[in-house]
Every structure is written in structure tokens, then in C-alpha cells.
Amino acid sequence: MDTSLKNNDGALDADNKNYQDYKDEPDKTSDVLDVTKYNSMVDCCHKNYSTFTSEWYINERKYNDVPEGPKKADVHRCTII
């Protein structure tokens, strides 16, 4: 079970920023996904993209339908610690 986002505003803020970056520059999706790896201290593990915050789906219901967007594949799930 992924509890990394519960009671962790830092991780949620990072995800929201990454999502906004994705919307602004959809051709740089891989760069956006890499951003959280460069926080000063992070705890990373592989998670399916579908486990990311529900806010992403609320803000952009067709996010997963974007052809250039990330597929439901393993990416880094990083939490600021």
C-alpha cells in the first residue's frame, strides 16, 4: 500500500508542480518525471503511474488519454523526507 502521500504536503506539492510542468510542456514528460529525483533528500521506490495523487485525475480527467503522456508503467515515486 502506498502511504507516501498521506500527511505529506511536501510530496503532494512536488507532484502538483510536476503535473503543472507536464501540462505546460507535454513534450518533456520524461524530464518532469525525473524532477523529484533531484530534491535534496528523497525516498524513492518504483510505483505504477496510476498510484499517483487523485488530484491529477480531478484536475485533468483525460490525463491518461494524452498520447504523448506517460503510460501506466513503472516510474519513480519519490517522497520528500
Curated annotation (Swiss-Prot):
Answer whether the UniProt record assigns the keyword Cytoplasm to this protein.
no
Superkingdom, natural source: Viruses
Region described as Disordered: spans on this chain: 1-28
Where are the disulfide bridges? none
Keywords from UniProt, A to Z, are:
Early protein, Host cytoplasm, Host-virus interaction
Which intervals carry biased composition (Basic and acidic residues)?
14-28
Q: Where in the cell is it found?
A: Host cytoplasm
Q: What induces it?
A: Expressed in the early phase of the viral replicative cycle.
Q: Report the principal subcellular site.
A: host cell
Q: Name one GO cellular component term.
A: host cell cytoplasm
Oligomeric form and interacting partners: Interacts with host IL1B.
Function noted in UniProt: May subvert the host innate immune response by interacting with host IL1B and interfering with its function.
Q: Which family does it belong to?
A: Belongs to the asfivirus L83L family.
- This protein is called what? Protein L83L
Organism, as annotated? African swine fever virus (isolate Tick/South Africa/Pretoriuskop Pr4/1996)
Upper classification of the source organism reads: Viruses, Varidnaviria, Bamfordvirae, Nucleocytoviricota, Pokkesviricetes
